[in-house]
Amino acid sequence: MTVNMRRIVEDLIRVEGVIGSLLVGKDGLVVASTLMDEEDAEILGAMSAAVFGEIDKATKRIGVGALVDAIIDAEQGSILMLEARELILVVITQRMVNLGLVKMEMRRASKRISEAVPI
């Protein structure tokens, strides 16, 4: 399964403007990553899972349902997160990027993840 997951996150960095991607469990453990620095991947994985979980709690609390995806915009880029079969797909982009295209590719990746992960 890990080889398939690695290929899925690698395919995402082919999108223009995407500089990194990783797949993490809701516990923050990294399943697959394209980040060169393993420590950075572990830190980003843990933080992404925590942020995703807190936003999910907030959306449920205010009555709009479970979190599906989130975009965090920063000065020099964005972090996109999407739930994929009990995992969280995280993509890091440059500032100037076609977010619609990135989200479309993330949805495709999510479908591939769902097919690869047993129910």
Language-model-detected regions and their locations in the chain:
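Non-catalytic interaction/Regulatory regions outside core domains
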Residues: 1-119
